[in-house]
């Protein structure tokens, strides 16, 4: 039985990769990488996101200046059709991932009831 669980996990991984929503994220990501300005904005977003997550993990909040930078970056991203499409595709994929997470972790949740 223990090997079966890994087979199921690998099957799930392949199924996620086959989802049209996953394929759309890949497609849009490739388009972003092919566009220098979109790629630069995406890299700025990732760097900003990592910085904010690090701050929050250490109990800090973004300063007013950092919040302004975040808003400005968000506006630039919203104005870029490729990045906008990427985040929309990510959102569609995240619906599946949230549902899968809920299903997979249900047995563990039962253990703490």
UniProtKB/Swiss-Prot annotation:
Cysteine disulfide partners in this protein: none
NCBIfam families given in the database record: PRK13676.1-1 (NF010209)
Family the entry assigns: Belongs to the UPF0342 family.
Protein name in the entry: UPF0342 protein M6_Spy0643
Organism: Streptococcus pyogenes serotype M6 (strain ATCC BAA-946 / MGAS10394)
Record lineage: Bacteria, Bacillati, Bacillota, Bacilli, Lactobacillales
């Amino acid at each position: 039985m223990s090997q079966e669980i890994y087979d199921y996990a690998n099957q799930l991984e392949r199924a996620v990769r086959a989802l049209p929503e996953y394929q759309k994220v890949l497609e849009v990501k490739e388009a972003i990488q092919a566009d220098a300005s979109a790629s630069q904005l995406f890299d700025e977003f990732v760097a900003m996101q990592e910085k904010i997550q690090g701050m929050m993990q250490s109990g800090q909040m973004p300063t007013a200046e950092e919040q302004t930078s975040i808003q400005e970056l968000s506006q630039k991203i919203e104005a870029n059709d490729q990045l906008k499409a990427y985040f929309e595709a990510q959102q569609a994929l995240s619906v599946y991932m949230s549902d899968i997470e809920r299903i997979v972790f249900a047995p563990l949740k039962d253990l703490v009831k």
